Amino acid sequence: MLLHIGLDDTDSPNGMCTTYLGALLYRELSRFGEPVDLPKLIRLNPNIPYKTRGNGAVSLTFDILEDYLNEAKELVVKTVKKLAEVEHENTNPGIAFLEGEVPEILRRFAIKALREHVTIDEAEKIAKKAGAEIVKLKLGRGIIGALASIGYPLNNYTYELLAYRKLENREKVRRVDRDSVFEMDRKFYPFTYDNVDPFKKTILITPHGKDPVLVGIRGIDKGKVLLAYENVIINENVEMIQLFKTNQSTDDHLVWKKIGDIKLYDNVIVKGKVASKYWERGRHVFFEIEDETGKIRVAAFEPTKKFRNYVRKLLPGDEVIVAGGVKEHEGVLTINLEKFYPIKLVPKVEYRKPKCPKCGGTMKSKGDYLKCKRCGYKMPKVLIPVKLPRDLERKIYEVPPDARKHLSRPLVLPKSEDKFIGPL
């Protein structure tokens, strides 16, 4: 009998990680049956305000004899109750069990949980219709992700290898050799990616909190991901490693929409015209985009660093495609820019004073006429239009690795442009 197990909302800023629980159970459940595939790490809607750290849920699928089903479920519940950060006010774990094949209604629910806002009440109704068993701890908000991780149709996927720390090391600085990570990246990029930030000269595979994760290496080839890990020098004991199949770096969260159809917490791709000159507030860069159905604000926030320089080059009238998650900023619906593509740029024209026709000197404006600073020649005030280069190419611009969302697909990966500019 196939038993699908989903877990979510077990962590907090103080520690724990749902992937760690998944990796533990992947080993423990092997005494009851055979795993059908690698565990799945499913990232859900990154815009939801009460999400866990990375809004990631985990699911496991095992082929288990019916005699062991109840024992396997009891083990899962016992482990989650023991290790989840239930003391934290915002941690509300959820567990889901489904026996047999995954029904279509659960697949549709998973896609909705990826792209839109879903309530606990909706999840409970879907569980009943799908024949899934749910276990709620506290508010049990985690049942949303638990059910979605089981139902998620992982047609597009990448891999992530996670190495976990021993309990006694989790309050200490992670001891990972920086130079070895850069060397690993040189060897295996782009089959593994987002390992380092080449501009800041920092490594990105190590998180910073008290959670159990020591390093995480992402890639599109599981063999190369494993080899990449072997090339990293780690100066502390590792409890275990686990390879996950995941929807990270797939762009599956993004949906083409007209501006008039956009809702709070959506993840959208929008085609339109720049409707305003950019403005800045608090190191964030903003502009507006419009189509025939409406207008919406777009933001390149401070963590995107040099990416903001490209946004500053956009001019009113430019035709562009933008992509990102929709949140409220200063009470206004705003697309948090992940990438953009200039389709058609308006000419950039600057009006300049001519040189003096007598001596070639510089002309100075004097009300309604011009006067040469060198020879004093006067002439009517006529400015000459000069077309300036735009300094933007017809290509996709993306945020830097350390500002990238888990779900956003880096341009270095195959088919990274298909969803974004394929429909043009």
Curated annotation (Swiss-Prot):
User: Which EC number(s) does the record attach to this protein?
Assistant: 6.3.4.22
List where this protein forms a coiled coil. none
Q: Report keywords, A-Z.
A: ATP-binding, Cytoplasm, Ligase, Nucleotide-binding, tRNA processing
User: Which BP terms does GO give this entry?
Assistant: tRNA wobble cytosine modification
Q: Name one Pfam family in it.
A: tRNA_anti-codon
Q: Where would you find this protein in the cell?
A: Cytoplasm
Q: Name one GO cellular component term.
A: cytoplasm
Q: Which residues bind DNA?
A: 268-342
Name one molecular function that GO assigns to this entry.
ligase activity, forming carbon-nitrogen bonds
User: How is this protein named in the record?
Assistant: tRNA(Ile2) 2-agmatinylcytidine synthetase TiaS
Name the source organism: Pyrococcus horikoshii (strain ATCC 700860 / DSM 12428 / JCM 9974 / NBRC 100139 / OT-3)
